[in-house]
A protein has these predicted regions:
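The feature marks proteins involved in alpha-glucan
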Residues: 1-51, 61-64
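Substrate-binding/active-site clefts of carbohydrate-active enzymes
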Residues: 40-46, 55-223
Length: 223
């Protein structure tokens, strides 16, 4: 059986239901130098963080009765920043924005670990959103899911016809609660993939932190 796979390192993907990887060059001109230069000096004991968690797909829609109706990254930023500032939050925590096929997963079953979802625009538009948050004094934290991934045929599962990213023993490699596959942390290549991915979002997208999801399934085998 021939499977069509996406590039695990792709920076952009076609909008669902299409699944092709798209080449992208990073040429964004960041304007958050002041924020980036000052964030390391922040003392959380004197100025605590107040974090607003948000799911971009459902926080606000152009048509509230159409679940396939989305604002762009920039349109979301224009609406979300004033609200966050008015409510007194210092940071937003974005539920997973890495490309994912199934809306019902809320992004927690991703296939494109190096790409912001194309539901709301392209990588440069996502950069512009983060840049705008920073210029307005708001930090950005990403939910990050290094624990499991879905079985979609274009994704990581059985990537080269073998158990490349997941455990071969399905007692360890399959999570019955989520109907998804567990990363094989025993493989150096898999650890490198995940660590590189975390660094990628900090270096290329200027994020301020990550919240690691489902750590219990990474540490324990009683799933």
């Amino acid at each position: 059986k021939i499977m069509q796979k996406g590039d695990p390192y792709a920076h952009f993907w076609e909008k669902k239901p299409l699944t092709a990887s798209i080449s992208w060059n990073f040429e964004y001109d960041w304007k958050d130098k002041t924020w980036m230069g000052s964030r390391g000096k922040h003392n959380s004991l004197q100025s605590p963080y107040v974090v607003y968690e948000v799911h971009l797909a459902s926080w606000m829609r152009p048509d509230p009765f159409d679940e396939e109706s989305y604002f762009s990254y920039w349109q979301i930023a224009q609406r979300l920043v004033p609200y966050v500032k008015q409510m007194g939050f210092t940071h937003v925590e974005l539920m997973p924005v890495m490309e994912y096929p199934f809306d019902g997963s809320w992004g927690y079953q991703g296939t494109g670990y190096f790409a912001p979802t194309s539901r709301f625009g392209n990588p440069e538009e996502f950069m512009a959103m983060i840049d705008f948050f920073h210029q307005e004094g708001i930090g950005v934290i990403l939910d990050w899911v290094p624990s499991h991934f879905p079985y979609d045929s274009h994704g990581l599962f059985m990537f080269d016809g073998t158990h490349t990213y997941e455990y071969a023993d399905m007692r360890k490699g399959f999570h019955p609660d989520w109907n998804s596959y567990i990363f094989n942390y025993a493989r150096g290549e898999v650890r490198s993939f995940l660590i590189s991915n975390a660094h990628f979002w900090f270096n290329y997208y200027h994020i301020d932190g990550i919240r690691v999801d489902a750590v219990s399934s990474m540490l324990k085998l009683n799933y």
